[in-house]
Amino acid sequence: LCAEKKFSNLRGLLYFTDCLKKPPEAYEHDMKLWWPHNEIMISSLMLYRDTRDEKYLEWFEKTVAYCKEHFADPEYGEWYGYLRRDGKPTMPACKGCTFKGPFHVPRCLIMVDTMLGEILAR
């Protein structure tokens, strides 16, 4: 996976990296965003479902563990939208804003639930 190098070096995915190693310009360049992690969960489980290659299941499990530990708020529910490089929520913490609505997390969880059902039914 293209995410393999970045995930292992940075403990979670970063949204912006410059391929020429120049300074990024976007405000959120050093943040970890919720939706790329949702997409990794979906795509890795989909790849596992379709290929049965264990490396994709490992990616799925690694991403789920990271998201549960860092994005999910066990006390008040929902996921934080933005984490700092160290995996802690940005301050002030954001669970909903103009860019983070009720789409990616529910979609991810519904798709994952459906695919797990398909995998277990085989």
Protein language model annotation of sequence segments:
Residues 1-122:
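Glycan-recognition and catalytic cores of secretory/periplasmic carbohydrate-active enzymes
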